[in-house]
Amino acid sequence: MDFELEPTLESIVEHDSLKWIFVGGKGGVGKTTTSSSIAVQLALSKPNDQFLLISTDPAHNLSDAFCQKFGKDARPVEGLPNLSCMEIDPEAAMSDLQQQASQYNNDPSDPMKNIMNDMTGSIPGIDEALSFMEVLKHIKNQKASDGDSDEKTVAYKTIIFDTAPTGHTLRFLQLPATLEKLLGKFKQLSGKLGPMLNMLGGGQQQDIFEKMNEIQKNVSEVNEQFTNPDLTTFVCVCISEFLSLYETERMIQELVSYNMDVNSIVVNQLLFADNDGSCKRCASRWKMQQKYLDQMAELYEDYHVVKMPLLGTEVRGIDNLKKFSKFLLSPYDPEKDGSLVFDMEEK
């Protein structure tokens, strides 16, 4: 390229049409801090809009990051009312699904009742499926807010996902296309077997088929939105080490194969130890980090590569997140901003 892209996420924060922002990477690289920081900057820059940060990682950390308890329902962040957070709890959601399945009807001989119970049993990838159900719900809310619906729904301008480690995230992003094909086949099958199932199930199956049609439409819309760069983008998070860089490259290749927009990488935990001669370990580690930063500069010359400092304490609480997140928009300068490394409030 003839020019270097800004090493910031300013283009994402200022983007006016983004509906979905995914933040992902290897475990332990700072995904939650990064996703929380992006959400905070979005909320600060657009105070008249509502934003939602969802954790799809079974090991929820949003409550720890904001020092505030979150659950399966969206709750506003204290001190930043136009940002809400929620943590999807797969076990609780599975329990609800099984309860609904057991109450499907009171006829123990109904074959559909057993099918529903089996479907809500031990399903591989249930974390991803439940996360996707949450996406479908918000797609429905978008439609309700765009129309004349009387339902009290909150239409969030942008939804940010604090995702599970790479493997879970990639399975989650495959779901729309996979489900779209599966529902299409199920629709064909239901057309052939519908009359027989209605005889067996007392006519209740018609409701299921109607719901399947509605789900298929919503899934198709999600698939379209996820592959539209004006609506969806993915932010990769890594640290400047070999394994993390390797995982990032693998993830980017996968995302490109899904036709998803990805042009931003956040590199966390950098030491910036050029003038730290008193700490040999810091200097040695910074030298190693610089080696991988140089490799990233070659590999990702057409990406926004954001370099974030390693701090002296954890980034917890809304005040600390506000301080730290500003470096997503204005590059960290160790000469000017070095004091911030030890300036965070202990929580």
UniProtKB/Swiss-Prot annotation:
Top EC class per UniProt?
A: hydrolase
An example GO BP is: tail-anchored membrane protein insertion into ER membrane
In short, the EC number is: 3.6.-.-
**Where on this chain does Zn(2+) bind?**
C279, C282
Q: Where is the signal peptide?
A: none
**Gene Ontology terms for molecular function:** ATP binding; ATP hydrolysis activity; metal ion binding
Stored InterPro entries: Anion-transp_ATPase-like_dom, ATPase_ArsA/GET3, ATPase_ArsA/GET3_euk, P-loop_NTPase
Q: Which UniProt keywords apply?
A: ATP-binding, Cytoplasm, Endoplasmic reticulum, Golgi apparatus, Hydrolase, Metal-binding, Nucleotide-binding, Transport, Zinc
Localization per Swiss-Prot or TrEMBL: Cytoplasm; Endoplasmic reticulum; Golgi apparatus
Q: Where is the active site?
A: D57
Coiled-coil segments: none
Name the protein family. Belongs to the arsA ATPase family.
Q: What is this protein called?
A: ATPase GET3
Q: What is the lineage of its organism?
A: Eukaryota, Fungi, Dikarya, Ascomycota, Saccharomycotina
Q: Quick one: which gene encodes this?
A: GET3
